[in-house]
């Protein structure tokens, strides 16, 4: 958050560190009393007569339904279905005698010590799982249909930490924050302006970590240009270290079917495993999966025009956070929060009950 400095020396934080930061922020601002836990909004109906949202809320502890109202509906749940991850329809999954796990349903008591593990996928989830499991497993294989771009760098910002030591807490945080924002913009502009050179640089970067003998052309040369899809960050090069140690391997092939012992590939090779992890992504779910109606008419979001990536045409008093996709998500979310506060304060100042974006005659659908 812009108002609360991140004091950890690590710029790439793990889940416990982020949770600790959030709890600290909540406690410092006495926000816990304003948060209702284990509650899920399942339906929201806007009443133009009352200028209110009527909500149906499910209590997750006993599945009871409560009804309440609000002036403004601010959706901050992202655009994924966190209840269930995406898993392709693999042939003969039921034949596999081991465990098949999607990271979204990760069992806390999973014992993978000295086990053969296959991770299907090559995105951010797979890149996180492979090095974190490599130390304990017998062997772990990252099975990918096609390669992804990777960039390894330290998880600590030495320049940023040096700046913080020379300045006050808030000034240092402000300067480092802007340094990182500008560096991200410069990097993105370079990627887009010189895609071929950037592609060569990223592939050579992988070669430096894995050595000339590694088949980088097959396993680490994507079919697309950098930033057509997002790059994967490899903190401290941990995934490459796991591969160099021999505990982790990349296989580039397509899946024919599951077998009792593992996975048979279209090449004819069979990979054996005790555990198969399907790091194959998440399902999209817009507007938090809430059944939204405007004066009892169901909202069809596909027919609406988005305004400033946060509001929708002809939908009153609703804001949905959508952060950046080419920079830190939270930077975009923070700007939307600021705009929302200014907008609500403006309504109070003008003694208005609602706001509602409208499309003009000059708007062209794309």
Where are these regions (language model features)?
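Feature captures the FAD/FMN-dependent oxidoreductase FAD-binding
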Residues: 10-81, 202, 209, 247, ...
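Alpha/beta-hydrolase fold catalytic core
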Residues: 200, 204, 209-272
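Glycine/threonine-rich phosphate-binding loop and adjacent beta-strand/alpha-helix elements that clamp
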Residues: 279-348
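Rossmann-like dinucleotide-binding core of oxidoreductases
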Residues: 73-215, 248, 271, 322-366
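Short beta-strand to alpha-helix junction loop
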Residues: 5-24, 36, 120, 190-200, ...
